[in-house]
């Protein structure tokens, strides 16, 4: 393949992806697609996993986009989908980029409105999945330790008198 045909930047799902990366890793750069999902997509479309993203044709890029624009990956296991049993439709879907962000934001907002435990934790900005919060996840300014000024000597303790339980004069 000549140098003119190699694309160093490839536009994929409205996002610029480095064309020098191998195909599975380049697809994994897109939000909503991980390495395993990328490998399933590559197998479905009979692409070479060792090729660079900049080496594949524009038709193959369109095939990849069309496969995920349908929000389903045909003949793939249910565990590969990143949105299983959708709240409104009940279908398994695989969302990418802004669709994924939109659905997750709507889920969080629905839980806040219903005042479920998860919604309350989200609205308070706390951890949701049962993690400990005593020491980790702290936000806000830290309060340091106050130190005495270096030039001032510390006050010496006075010897206790008779009223304070000290020795009486004779």
Swiss-Prot record:
GO terms for molecular function: rRNA binding; structural constituent of ribosome. HAMAP family: Ribosomal_uS13. This is Small ribosomal subunit protein uS13. The keyword Ribosomal protein applies. Belongs to the universal ribosomal protein uS13 family. It holds the Pfam family Ribosomal_S13. One of its GO terms (biological process) is translation. Keywords: Ribonucleoprotein, Ribosomal protein, RNA-binding, rRNA-binding. Residues 133-162 have a biased composition (Low complexity). Residues 132-170 are annotated as: Disordered. GO terms for cellular component: cytosol; small ribosomal subunit. Part of the 30S ribosomal subunit. Forms a loose heterodimer with protein S19. Forms two bridges to the 50S subunit in the 70S ribosome. The keyword Ribosomal protein applies. Located at the top of the head of the 30S subunit, it contacts several helices of the 16S rRNA. In the 70S ribosome it contacts the 23S rRNA (bridge B1a) and protein L5 of the 50S subunit (bridge B1b), connecting the 2 subunits; these bridges are implicated in subunit movement. It comes from the Archaea.
